[in-house]
Structures are given as C-alpha cells and as structure tokens.
Amino acid sequence: MMLPEACVATILSFTTPADTISSAAVSSVFRVAGDSDFVWEKFLPTDYCHVISRSTDPHRIFSSKKELYRCLCESILIDNGRKIFKIEKLSGKISYILSSRDLSITWSDQRHYWSWSPRSDSRFSEGVQLIMTDWLEIIGKIQTGALSPNTNYGAYLIMKVTSRAYGLDLVPAETSIKVGNGEKKIKSTYLSCLDNKKQQMERVFYGQREQRMATHEVVRSHRREPEVRDDGWMEIELGEFETGSGEGDDDKEVVMSLTEVKGYQLKGGIAIDGIEVRPKPLKVRAGTN
C-alpha cells in the first residue's frame, strides 16, 4: 500500500536534498512529492527571502521552490555585486565569496601599490592586482549567523600569480582565523609555488633579508603553497572554524586574514579575486568504512 503524497512529502522534508533527489526513482508518488514547494522550502536557507532581496536581480520570479534552490546552487550576486551567495546542491549548506572590494587591503587605494580594473576571468565587475609593496595585509570579515549552523567551514583567499610576479616565495606569509573573542589561529604559507631557478636569482637581491627571516624557514615537505581550483584560479587556505547552533547570541564575527609584514620583502604580481567561505568536507575517522 502506497503512502499518500502529503505523507511522503512530510517524510522527505526531514531528509536532505540528496535523499530527496535520489528518492524520485522509487515511484511517481515520491517524484511528485519530492518536487513540491513544501519539501524544497525546508531545504532553503531560513532567510532566503532576505538573500533574494539583496541580489542584483531582486524581482526575478521563480516557478517553484525547487527552481529557486537550483538557482542558489549556481550562485547569485548580492550586495551590489560585492558578494556571491551559494548553497551546496546535496546538503543545502551556505557558502559566500567576498569580492576584493569587500575586503580590507592595506594601501589598495594607492595606485602605485595596487591596480583596480575589470577582469574577464573574475566573478565580479573588477579585481585588484598587486604592483609592489613590502607590507601585505588582506582582511575579510563575515558573521557566523550568515552561514549554516553547526558546520565546519574553511576560508580561502582566491588569487593568481602573474607572469611578472616577484618576491613571493622567499618569505612566508601568515594566515589567521579569529572567531568572536576566541583565540586567533595562525599558520604560515607561501604566496607562490617553489621555483628554484627564480629563488636563486632573487637571493642575489634579497639575500640579507632572507637571512633575517631564517627563523621562518619551512621544510619543503611541510611547505604550504597555493592550490589550483577548478575555475582556473588558485587558493590559499586561511584557516577553518566551526559555526554554532545559530540560536540566541551565537552570532559571532569571523576575521580572516593573510599578512606578510615582517620581512620588509618587496613583492608584486598577485591578483586577488576575493575570499571564499565554504563548508569543509566531513572527515572520515580512521577505521571506518
């Protein structure tokens, strides 16, 4: 005996988007129930109406909640095109990308240090490229209340190294994450991948500075470097953090940063697209299948 469609819809609303999508193969009742607005509204962020109102096309009409869900999976521009909002297809977890204009970048308003211009490879209307500086400081902020509750998040600086880059692989930068009044978590990373030939040339010019920074020497096997993304950009993990239950006064400010201010090392030739904050994959415990 088949359950009524309304009962099936109620059951599906307590599962996940992935379960609902796969259940469509069970029967026509599951397929119809799984397409209902009742089910998909449960999977949408609780503040989805507010998110849509902040989009660059706030008056767009969606034929169903499932269509809206799919749209958010593809991502939308919000806050005058300065942020990207997205949800994961199988889990409904929230992600954000803060554009370079939404970040605090020291001296980014000085044209002899940084250059702002439209980029065909950017998600946003413009990006910024470092011309030259010895004081690199990039800071982004987001509230935990804007993210999915009880979720482990990672923050990633989206960047590219240009063909004329210099001074990026001699002195490590610091990455950090700080949530509310909690302890700041600091790690070190290089801004470009190791290039032995280029390093030998730069040592001629920056040898003394390199000696002053000898205490920051990183064993090659443990050297953190940018990693290639599927979209052609590269990313540096700034750190990770957990969101709380989202109830009461659980909303906290997350400060994410990348800095290189200790080596007085001239550097240039990196393009910044923004900082992505996205859920990290669940870790599989040793010994589990």
From Swiss-Prot:
Disulphide bridges: none
Residues covered by the F-box domain: 1-43
Entry-linked SUPFAM superfamilies: F-box domain
Short name of one Pfam family: PP2
GO MF terms, alphabetically ordered: carbohydrate binding
The protein's name: F-box protein PP2-B15
